[in-house]
Amino acid sequence: MAGKQILFREDARRALERGVNALADAVKVTLGPKGRNVVLEKKFGSPQIINDGVSIAREIELADPVENMGAQLVKEVATKTNDVAGDGTTTATVLAQAIIREGLKNVTAGANPMILRKGIEKAVAKAVEEIKAIAKPVETSEAIAQVAAISANDEEIGKLIAEAMEKVGKDGVITVEESQGLGTTLEVVEGMSFDRGYISPYMITDPDKMEAILNDPYILITDKKISAIADLLPILEKVVQTGKPLLIIAEDVEGEALATLVVNKLRGTLTCVAVKAPGFGDRRKAMLEDIAILTNGQVVSEELGFKLENATLSMLGRAKQVRVKKEETIIVGGQGSPEAIEKRIAQIKKQIEETTSDFDREKLQERLAKLAGGVAVIQVGAATETEMKEKKLRIEDALNATRAAVEEGIVAGGGTTYIHIIKALEELEKTATGDERTGIAIVRKALEEPLKQIAINAGLEGSVIVEKVKTLPVGHGFNALTEEYVDMIAAGIVDPAKVTRSALQNAASVAAMLLTTEALVAEKPEKEKKGPDMPNMDMM
């Protein structure tokens, strides 16, 4: 059995720092408009060329187990920031490295790590307060496009995401898929769609497209399996008198009930399409209820005391149009009351906040989008697979950044906001003493690092630019692309406040923990066994 190695004090902290630096140095070359790419080896397929901090961090495993612990800690900073805000992972890594570097200098010089940590936490709380105070809400489509363009480093992508958000609303679902073509396009599926199609192909109205289109139909929603025609007859007769088509959403329609519907359709007495209810179990009940609210109908369920044979026209939902394909049903223009839909949306949002399961959250978000007005699909195309994967990652990042911006507003980008909150930390420093004051100073100094790194990646002297930006009015900063000093928000160089805040909070959290390390236990690296020597050439 391999023994463990134990390192203490300075040795432990320095070994961790080497790991932190190895990971951070690989990630930080991607920061800013002139950041470079990193190539990742893939065991299968071609290497991946990317610009996304968290994807690079995830790939890094160091050979030395102690250094690897340091790298894994910083990886957590990037991953956590990605989970919370979906972007800003490189910034978070750069901040963590700076806080660790400055903090270790002070610990080596004899500062008490526990008190330093207190100072760091105080400084971060103050900084977050300042970020929230200067954040501007995002209202226009242009502002959304700017946020997305900065995150993806591409104006076209910015416009595409802004257009998608405009079409499906802030709560709509926007998915990113790989396309076969060269260009990147946007498709919007309006209305509520679910993945169930017609039960019988005899129900189609358009044989060329193999789909059924019902205009201004009645919609019967039930959680029952319908097999006896006697259950359906009363409501069918009422619908026939109106001359409108009928959509039936039920657990299943079979036997004589299905045969009757098909015969009526073929004779032209009643245009009717039956589809199975979406989802399973409790989720099915919830989705049927969503459809009922969207179309101003009721779920005809014996659990609620309604029998199918007693159903009336007022219990049926209405919509402008329903399109039913082989495996999909789309309800467009449901006639539910906006207040009822709003209430339902608020209820689902509450459930999203409270759920702990990622799967449930994803399903709830899908339901929310379907109620809120549709689904947009961005089809990513490129000349090669390597380029397409890189582009898809950037679009996903930009999408996350945009959602974060809508949630908590925007601040000046390019590391500028961090520079302008330094003043508030200087004031805070005056009120503290001893090692706590040093902790605040560590964060104050670390806040310069993102801008410095952006400048270095643009081939300039970082500290000169930082000093110059400190003298500019709040909101003015350095545009690394044109190498000019500008009003950042007016120039469209913005970051979501949520990303700026999360990056700092997560970086400080992990860095402060690392500073308080006094001992470290790790596996001993195993020595590779030597194989037998080559035989002497004389013996050949």
Curated annotation (Swiss-Prot):
Which InterPro entries does the record match to this protein?
Chaperonin_Cpn60_CS, Cpn60/GroEL, Cpn60/GroEL/TCP-1, GroEL-like_apical_dom_sf, GROEL-like_equatorial_sf, TCP-1-like_intermed_sf
The protein's annotated catalytic reaction(s) are: ATP + H2O + a folded polypeptide = ADP + phosphate + an unfolded polypeptide
Any one GO MF term held by the record is:
ATP-dependent protein folding chaperone
* UniProt keyword list: ATP-binding, Chaperone, Cytoplasm, Isomerase, Nucleotide-binding
Q: Residues that bind ATP, according to the entry?
A: 30-33, 87-91, 414, 479-481, 495
- Which example biological process does GO assign this protein? protein refolding
- EC main group: isomerase
Would you say which domain of life the source belongs to? Bacteria
Q: Mostly located where? A: cytoplasm
Q: What PROSITE patterns does UniProt report for this protein, alphabetically?
A: CHAPERONINS_CPN60
Q: Which GO terms describe its cellular component?
A: cytoplasm
Q: Where in the cell is it found?
A: Cytoplasm
Q: What is its EC number?
A: 5.6.1.7
Q: What does this protein do?
A: Together with its co-chaperonin GroES, plays an essential role in assisting protein folding. The GroEL-GroES system forms a nano-cage that allows encapsulation of the non-native substrate proteins and provides a physical environment optimized to promote and accelerate protein folding.
The family line of this record is:
Belongs to the chaperonin (HSP60) family.
Q: How does it assemble?
A: Forms a cylinder of 14 subunits composed of two heptameric rings stacked back-to-back. Interacts with the co-chaperonin GroES.
Name the record gives this protein? Chaperonin GroEL
Q: What's the name of its gene?
A: groEL
